[in-house]
């Protein structure tokens, strides 16, 4: 169905709630778990984050698309969301870095999206009832029951191993640092000096994580999620990095086994997001599904040791259960929103992890010092003798 402004679309939730709006992306139907993200900026980074695989993302900021899109802001090689929900799409793109409009970008990448939705009402529903499945479809009366059934039948994130689906299929090297406006190369690329070799386990890694490691003197070998730990160790790394990623960490037994092998070695380990959860599982902790997760760039987190408060970028639907923790796990960070565990370290190993995203992209860089702590551990091992 269309009107003077284009094709009409409808979002149907699994509880039967309907939101009527307009199609702003590719034509068609999509279904996924509906979550909300509270970031004000960074919509292109959000939708290209592999951690959003299997999900339809609601952007709570009311005005989206005003700076267009460009290839430098992509956090991976493709868009990973199953759909997008916004309040209002900007009719123009105004930024000197813009290469194409956001709507064109969505259409070219075959992403179904809907605008003119009361995103505040939708967010309140998700906050009260928890994340639930939804279906975006052309707005026809006969489609309502179809969309409802699709939403009801869609698989929950619980029990889904999505990391192996979004991971790289081959081993590759990465030596590109951060992009600086008006500079063709990062300072480190000009120096051409790398102090450490890091094996990065790709469970859905974001490019800015790789760039921030390179900025600190690391040469990276990125490996698939299911890489045998013997292969990784044969690469003679100075450290192991466990990346972010989508889905439930509990089915990722291959990753848990690999991490347990690494923990037997005197090698520094740093995990982020899904990597944080996998390190916890490998160390004997438990994981639970959250009601609506943490998705946004304004989440306050307390550093336990110093009582310092940092504002962080977050994107996860599962969390480490802080109850019944093994004695060798120390909690280093906690959320000031809901008290959930945000960081941990192993007291008898050179291993630590953080639930949020210290690389931001989008979001604040308050937690970027965690990368510096990783470098400190690498120095401690490599140059102690």
Swiss-Prot record:
Organism: Buchnera aphidicola subsp. Schizaphis graminum (strain Sg)
Reaction(s) catalysed by this chain's protein: hydrogencarbonate + L-glutamine + 2 ATP + H2O = carbamoyl phosphate + L-glutamate + 2 ADP + phosphate + 2 H(+)
Enzyme Commission number(s): 6.3.5.5
UniProt pathway: Amino-acid biosynthesis; L-arginine biosynthesis; carbamoyl phosphate from bicarbonate: step 1/1; Pyrimidine metabolism; UMP biosynthesis via de novo pathway; (S)-dihydroorotate from bicarbonate: step 1/3
Gene from which this protein is expressed: carA
Protein name: Carbamoyl phosphate synthase small chain
PANTHER family per record: CARBAMOYL-PHOSPHATE SYNTHASE SMALL CHAIN (PTHR43418:SF7), MULTIFUNCTIONAL TRYPTOPHAN BIOSYNTHESIS PROTEIN-RELATED (PTHR43418)
GO molecular function: ATP binding; carbamoyl-phosphate synthase (glutamine-hydrolyzing) activity; glutaminase activity
Functional summary from the UniProt entry: Small subunit of the glutamine-dependent carbamoyl phosphate synthetase (CPSase). CPSase catalyzes the formation of carbamoyl phosphate from the ammonia moiety of glutamine, carbonate, and phosphate donated by ATP, constituting the first step of 2 biosynthetic pathways, one leading to arginine and/or urea and the other to pyrimidine nucleotides. The small subunit (glutamine amidotransferase) binds and cleaves glutamine to supply the large subunit with the substrate ammonia.
Binding site for L-glutamine: 51, 245, 247, 274, 277, 315, 318
Active site: 273, 357, 359
Presence of the UniProt keyword Cell division in the record: no
Family to which this protein belongs: Belongs to the CarA family.
Oligomeric and partner information: Composed of two chains; the small (or glutamine) chain promotes the hydrolysis of glutamine to ammonia, which is used by the large (or ammonia) chain to synthesize carbamoyl phosphate. Tetramer of heterodimers (alpha,beta)4.
Cross-referenced SUPFAM superfamilies: Carbamoyl phosphate synthetase, small subunit N-terminal domain, Class I glutamine amidotransferase-like
Keywords from the UniProt entry: Amino-acid biosynthesis, Arginine biosynthesis, ATP-binding, Glutamine amidotransferase, Ligase, Nucleotide-binding, Pyrimidine biosynthesis
Region CPSase, annotated ranges: 1-196
SMART domains: CPSase_sm_chain (SM01097)
HAMAP family on file: CPSase_S_chain
InterPro entries the UniProt entry points to: Anth_synth/Amidotransfase, CarbamoylP_synth_ssu, CarbamoylP_synth_ssu_N, CarbP_synth_ssu_N_sf, Class_I_gatase-like, CPSase_GATase1, GATASE
EC category: ligase
Residue span(s) of domain Glutamine amidotransferase type-1: 197-384
Stored Gene3D superfamilies: 3.40.50.880, Carbamoyl-phosphate synthase small subunit, N-terminal domain
GO biological process terms, semicolon-separated: 'de novo' pyrimidine nucleobase biosynthetic process; 'de novo' UMP biosynthetic process; glutamine metabolic process; L-arginine biosynthetic process
